[in-house]
């Protein structure tokens, strides 16, 4: 029955797991979510605005929404402003350290009305709605995170990327995050980097 024999647990000191205790995974305590339900707007019109702000900082997002000439900007602006106020009041986050880690638009119910026409006929009016979800994330702990990554050898860094959740890996390897935290140069030197970037 050696095939079903359990593997012995290694008693080695796992520095990656220890470091992960101080920096929680997505959805634990460094995120705040705001949802807007049944906003009277089509999904496509809201999504073209949402795609422009995903992954950006809070201040940059507000500036973009104020200057874009679309009607969808106002309800999205209100949602993000409300999410930042909740993060500042409820969790004592600094607004300067918030980024839009997740922004999505889903189709809502379609309101139907009847428009009377000539000769007793009627036409159907369809008013589409959408549900918008905004997730703000505090990146304060990432100030020391890039220094920790720079101290690792390429082999250990690749092992760390393998232990990360998919959400944290995408956030670490996205272009805007690399530019903001100046960790672009040493990540490009690592073998298998492209393998993780496309995931």
From Swiss-Prot:
Pfam families: Ribosomal_L22. One of its GO terms (biological process) is translation. It comes from the Eukaryota. InterPro entries: Ribosomal_uL22, Ribosomal_uL22_bac/chlpt-type, Ribosomal_uL22_bac/org-type, Ribosomal_uL22_CS, Ribosomal_uL22_sf. It is found in: Plastid, Chloroplast. Signal peptide: none annotated. One of its GO terms (cellular component) is large ribosomal subunit. The keyword Amino-acid biosynthesis does not apply. Keywords: Chloroplast, Plastid, Ribonucleoprotein, Ribosomal protein, RNA-binding, rRNA-binding. Its main location: plastid. One of its GO terms (molecular function) is rRNA binding. Component of the chloroplast large ribosomal subunit (LSU). Mature 70S chloroplast ribosomes of higher plants consist of a small (30S) and a large (50S) subunit. The 30S small subunit contains 1 molecule of ribosomal RNA (16S rRNA) and 24 different proteins. The 50S large subunit contains 3 rRNA molecules (23S, 5S and 4.5S rRNA) and 33 different proteins. uL22c binds 5S rRNA in vitro; the central segment of the protein (approximately amino acids 30 to 124) but not the last 28 amino acids are required for this binding. Component of the chloroplast ribosome (chloro-ribosome), a dedicated translation machinery responsible for the synthesis of chloroplast genome-encoded proteins, including proteins of the transcription and translation machinery and components of the photosynthetic apparatus. Belongs to the universal ribosomal protein uL22 family. This is Large ribosomal subunit protein uL22c. The lineage of its organism: Eukaryota, Viridiplantae, Streptophyta, Embryophyta, Tracheophyta.
């Amino acid at each position: 029955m050696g095939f079903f024999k359990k593997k012995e647990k290694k008693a080695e000191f796992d520095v990656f797991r220890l470091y992960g205790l101080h920096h929680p995974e997505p959805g634990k305590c460094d995120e705040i979510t705001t949802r807007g339900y049944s906003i009277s707007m089509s999904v496509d019109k809201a999504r073209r605005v949402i795609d422009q702000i995903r992954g950006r900082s809070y201040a940059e997002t507000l500036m973009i929404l104020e200057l874009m000439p679309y009607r969808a900007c106002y309800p999205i602006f209100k949602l993000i402003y409300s999410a930042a106020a909740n993060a500042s009041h409820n969790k004592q986050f600094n607004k300067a350290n918030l980024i839009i880690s997740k922004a999505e638009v889903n189709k809502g119910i379609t309101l139907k009305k009847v428009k009377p026409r000539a000769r007793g006929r009627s036409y159907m009016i369809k008013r589409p709605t959408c549900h918008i979800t905004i997730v703000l994330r505090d990146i304060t702990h990432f100030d020391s995170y890039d220094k920790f990554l720079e101290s690792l050898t390429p082999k250990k860094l690749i092992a760390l990327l393998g232990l990360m959740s998919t959400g944290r890996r995408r956030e670490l390897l996205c272009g805007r995050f690399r530019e903001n935290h100046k960790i672009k140069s040493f990540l490009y030197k690592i073998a298998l980097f492209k393998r993780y970037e496309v995931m």
